[in-house]
Amino acid sequence: MNPDEPEADETTPEEEEWQLYATAGYAAAEDPWDDLVEIEDDEEEEEEWFDGDDFETNGQTLDWDSPPCPAPLGIAHMIRLGTCNHCLHRVGGRRTEEIGEKGGASLRAEAFARDKELEAFEAPDLCPLCENLFEDVDNIVERIVEQTGELDHGSLQVGVHVPKDLIQEEDRIRTRHAAPGSRPLKAAFSKAVQTGVSTRMDGVEFVKERPDLMILIDCLTLRVDVDIRPVFIYGRYRKLDRGIPQTRWPCRACRGRAEGCEACEGSGLQYPDSVQDLIGEPFRLVLSAEDTSFHGMGREDIDVRCLGRGRPFVLEVKRPKVRRTDLEEVMEAVNSNASGKIEISDLRWTNRSEVSRIKETRAEKSYTIRFSVEEPPEESFIVESISNLSGVTLEQQTPKRVSHRRADRNRKRKVVSIDNVVVEDNEVQFSVRCEAGTYVKELVHSDEGR
């Protein structure tokens, strides 16, 4: 052995220094991963679809894994849940001679015949699918008949509001246990009400669009509201007298409040007559309605007459108890009562869609204008100057007379044609056809160059 080498049990200074570090927790003396604990994988528990806590089962066991209807076990399970006869029929998925409550009763009887113990099962009193809502169908039908008995109608539409939590609960149970294609609660309840109304009222048609009456049912409070839909009448009017606005003009002093003021003598109107009321009031009385709205194809100024064939309009009669009448008779009454102020013609029944057409149509308008000139120039100059405007596109700034209610901007409007220019002493008359929206008065006097 080499005398210079250290003995086996002897340690060199370098080794002693290393051991000090090792015992202090460095190097391989301590494994930093020794404190890790192996975690066993837990099996994922399948989420329970429904735990049945909302149902009173009187200590009896319900089989939540039963097959859906129309299987006999599925129908038996729905009976154990406390399903009412009406809901049992709509989710059972089986044909029966009767429908509704009687159909469900026959399915229940068949289930009892198959399983004698099922009849002794103490099911909850409250149906989990409708919360016994179908028990109130007769009550609701009675209210509908009472509220619509004096109203003229041929078609109804039923709208039902069901609490959201009941809709969700019913949908959850029906999706799991009902027969495929079963009718949802809201649709089934609406159908039951319609069936009940049909048995009480002859000749009633249930529609999804444009009903005469809209029946609104709140299933939480069992409140029934009847919305009487308006009727619409198309026609044309000729305004023969000046000083009549097209629609009601509220009083400037009291702003049209119901009791009015001294300025309007309690009427709430700036002008006692309007085209709207001269036409609408006879219709309101004949149809026993609450009010009217007037929709004209454009409008003329209050001091302007409307002649020729007349201006198209649609009269909306709101909440009428009577929905049909002889239009010719009413037209004669309107023309007679107006005492030469207006005349109407071409009346016919229409619908709301024509209101949009009337409002959106930008029809050209024709005027016959007559004005005077203090110091008229030569007749040839007048005729030439006016005739040269035919076909010209005007750039009109908002007139001063309407600047308080219209945006101040420039509008381009075309003069389609000008003809029949006549000069008589200091008066000039001509006919003009121009684009919708043209300020005709300002075309004549220029509104100080605006």
Kindly give the residue locations of the regions a language model identified:
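Non-catalytic RNA-recognition surface used by pseudouridine synthases
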Residues: 2-435, 439-450
